[in-house]
């Protein structure tokens, strides 16, 4: 992949861009296997590779410059703005949107936030596309509600220019820190979420909900999880840290008893909507802390699926699962180092199979799916 911004030293997001893609995959696979146990054999499936360009469904743009000439991209440590509207990771459909957004910023008087002076209102623009129907969600991250009325007034012009904007919202982030979003979300459109489909499973993207940024590889990850679980012929499962339900909904058969747990009420609302659309009658999604939910239970299902944040599932949940001994643990991780630490603590389990998914090309990061099987005493 060729990138002018990377070559000029303006953007360092793709730290492995100098490596051939085949070498990137080799290094990631070696890194993964170096972290895993060496005292027994397990199946190592071939890594799932990604497109090298135009694979992202989301742009996170820092807004800098002036209200008349806004810059969408990133801000260098010394404060200079770098335009990333031509980033080769974004789909072609984003390219005509960015100039119109720049014009809208001027029309609505959304002064870019100046970090040094602590002045201005517009901090970030977040753009997400559904690959299902190519509709888009646009979020403006503002310092306050000061410019909200002006934004609302100018909105009809923007919607006429970009009818693909199905969801438009404003997030209020008042803190002078490098935090992407705040607690308050104000949806400005009748529709509140994007519709998406992975492997014929309906999923929904809400403004503050987490969603994978590489949909093709995410579809492979979900499909693989579903295939592995179907082989196990289980009747009950928990999906902990379930997000919008992508894993659990791919793994649930018509009569499977599925309980999905996620701390975010927004994500749970999306998961429930998907389950209803699929007509699944034995599925329950709850907005709770995953570890707290598990520890309150005196029995476990045959399979526990976990998809934790980068910190892993942690010592408390590891100890609980190790003592309760579900037959299978399916572990999806975006941080193989913490996953390996958790697996080491799950001493009653052995790895059956593992597969790497290259969700983040040109970086050292990747996703990994691991099936753990209870060892017979």
From Swiss-Prot:
Amino acids binding S-adenosyl-L-methionine: 212, 241, 262, 307
EC number, as in UniProt: 2.1.1.189
BP-aspect Gene Ontology terms: rRNA base methylation
CDD domains in the cross-refs: AdoMet_MTases
Catalytic activity from the UniProt record: uridine(747) in 23S rRNA + S-adenosyl-L-methionine = 5-methyluridine(747) in 23S rRNA + S-adenosyl-L-homocysteine + H(+)
Pfam families assigned to the protein according to its UniProt record, in alphabetical order: tRNA_U5-meth_tr
Record key words, sorted: 4Fe-4S, Iron, Iron-sulfur, Metal-binding, Methyltransferase, rRNA processing, S-adenosyl-L-methionine, Transferase
PANTHER family, per the entry: RNA M5U METHYLTRANSFERASE, TRNA (URACIL(54)-C(5))-METHYLTRANSFERASE
Family label: Belongs to the class I-like SAM-binding methyltransferase superfamily. RNA M5U methyltransferase family. RlmC subfamily.
Full protein name: 23S rRNA (uracil(747)-C(5))-methyltransferase RlmC
Species for this entry: Proteus mirabilis (strain HI4320)
């Amino acid at each position: 992949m060729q990138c002018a911004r990377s070559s000029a030293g303006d953007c360092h997001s793709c730290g492995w861009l100098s490596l051939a893609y085949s070498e990137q995959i080799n290094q990631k696979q070696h890194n993964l296997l170096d972290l895993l146990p060496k005292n027994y054999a397990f199946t190592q499936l071939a890594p799932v590779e990604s497109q090298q360009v135009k694979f992202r469904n989301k742009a996170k743009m820092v807004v800098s410059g002036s209200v008349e000439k806004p810059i969408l991209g990133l801000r260098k440590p010394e404060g200079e703005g770098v335009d990333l509207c031509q980033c080769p990771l974004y789909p072609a459909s984003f390219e005509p949107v960015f100039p119109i957004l720049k014009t809208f910023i001027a029309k609505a008087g959304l002064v870019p936030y100046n970090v040094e002076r602590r002045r201005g209102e517009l901090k970030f623009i977040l753009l997400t596309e559904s690959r299902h129907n190519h509709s888009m969600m646009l979020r403006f991250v503002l310092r306050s509600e000061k410019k909200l009325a002006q934004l609302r007034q100018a909105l009809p012009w923007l919607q006429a220019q970009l009818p693909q904007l199905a969801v438009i919202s404003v997030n209020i982030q008042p803190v002078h820190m490098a935090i992407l979003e705040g607690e308050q979300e104000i949806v400005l459109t009748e529709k509140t979420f994007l519709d998406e489909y992975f492997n014929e499973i309906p999923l929904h993207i809400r403004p503050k909900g987490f969603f994978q940024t590489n949909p093709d590889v995410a579809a492979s990850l979900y499909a693989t999880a579903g295939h592995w679980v179907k082989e196990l012929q289980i009747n009950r499962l928990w999906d902990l840290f379930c997000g919008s339900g992508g894993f659990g909904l791919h793994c649930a058969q018509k009569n499977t008893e599925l309980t999905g747990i996620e701390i975010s009420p927004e994500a749970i609302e999306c998961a429930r909507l998907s389950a209803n659309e699929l007509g699944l009658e034995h599925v329950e999604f709850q907005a709770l802390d995953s570890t707290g939910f598990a520890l309150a239970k005196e029995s476990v299902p045959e399979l526990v699926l976990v998809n934790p944040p980068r910190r892993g599932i942690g010592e408390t949940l590891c100890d609980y699962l190790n003592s309760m001994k579900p037959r299978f643990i399916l572990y999806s991780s975006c941080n193989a180092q913490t996953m390996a630490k958790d697996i080491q603590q799950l001493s009653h389990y052995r790895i059956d199979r593992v597969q790497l998914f290259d969700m983040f090309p040109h970086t050292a990061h990747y996703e990994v799916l691991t099936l753990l099987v209870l060892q017979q005493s």
